[in-house]
Amino acid sequence: MSIAVFIDGTDAQQVTELKKFLKSYGAKVLDNTECSDANWPDELIKCIKFLNVCWKDESIAESDAKDVLTSVASMFIQLPPNKLIEAVPLFCEKLLDFSGDNIRRHKNKLFPLNLLFWGLNPKSHPRYEIFLTLIECAEKMGVLNEVITDPKKVASWLSECDCTVEECQKVWQKLYDAHIALGENRKAIEAMIYLLSTYNEVTAVNARQNAIKCIISVLQDPCLLSHDQLYALKPVQYLEGEPVHDFFKIFVSGDLNTFKNFLAKHPNFLSHNNLSEEACVHKLRLLTLMQLSENVNELSYHEAATQLGLKIEELEPFIIEAVRQRAVACKLDQVQKKILITGAFPRTFGRPQWINLHDTLVQWRSHLGTVQSSLSMMIQNESS
């Protein structure tokens, strides 16, 4: 794919023409001298502060503005490391200027930022600041979906760039804030969990508010049924002894009776944290059903209704909803009043579940070996 540039030519020639272009739009302090192979990096850096004409001056065609910013980004890739470290913060700071009435013109910033992020060496540390700027620009324009924000990929990039813990925390916080601003709560929770995972026993105290915020967000989401990963994080463990931790623990390993006892002691907890009692009870019933379904082939209607705190006539609609939410896979035997379990999803996934998975895989491998041996014998018999 060819990249649009301001003019064809060497980097020195491009910077010379860039200076002329910017001078024609008010950058009078730039000189008219020709750039050389020796000084073009310094001259390029001088031009950065005047790049805002690309989105402020309506007389510049949007295509020309995009070509200018793209040319600058492509030349950044050729900069020596020491000049790149100097140039990137200035460039990012300038692109974060969102002054001007025409928000559409700011969209030209995304392509050069992406070009720069992907064009630099994966281990280049300035990619960290470029990605931060990319997130903020995309969030301000409401197009965060145009930026790759998959947490696993972001974590890999941060590792490649050799970012400090503090820098990683800044990225995850920025991602969380951007997702929240755009109403993407599920993605915000994912970013927050990665943020909380960067804290240890010593620094966990600094993440107290974020930990509480994450717990409440997870509990508010009716489709999030796995809580043990968050529960194990140091900032969440730091909250032990506080009502929010006690309440969250109910959804990890508690039941409806524990829930009722908690509300008796803390009657205002739900309203203070914008939690619905009905939604919490429904989620807790789903989690209880998941736990009941582990390692069994069937459940009687009576047993299930008793454990879930439901009337018999309320059970079938609840089970159908649980299947829809993928909390359990089952069939209903309405004649014998039984729930036939065809697939169960563990409420928590700890050491017992890993051991069970290991044993199952070993058993499968053994069975496959038997099948392979039988097929080999059949082939030999047919050949003879």
Swiss-Prot record:
Cell compartments where the protein resides: Cytoplasm
User: Which residue ranges does the record assign to the PCI domain?
Assistant: 184-346
Q: Which Pfam families match?
A: eIF3m_C_helix, PCI
Q: Which GO terms describe its cellular component?
A: eukaryotic 43S preinitiation complex; eukaryotic 48S preinitiation complex; eukaryotic translation initiation factor 3 complex, eIF3m
Q: Write out the function statement from the record.
A: Component of the eukaryotic translation initiation factor 3 (eIF-3) complex, which is involved in protein synthesis of a specialized repertoire of mRNAs and, together with other initiation factors, stimulates binding of mRNA and methionyl-tRNAi to the 40S ribosome. The eIF-3 complex specifically targets and initiates translation of a subset of mRNAs involved in cell proliferation.
The record's section on HAMAP family has: eIF3m (MF_03012)
What is the residue range of the signal peptide feature? none
Citing just one GO molecular function, the answer is: translation initiation factor activity
Protein's recorded name: Eukaryotic translation initiation factor 3 subunit M
What InterPro entries is this protein classified in?
A: COPS7/eIF3m, eIF3m, eIF3m_C_helix, PCI_dom
Q: Which GO terms describe its biological process?
A: formation of cytoplasmic translation initiation complex
Q: What is its main location?
A: cytoplasm
Q: Does the keyword Coiled coil apply?
A: no
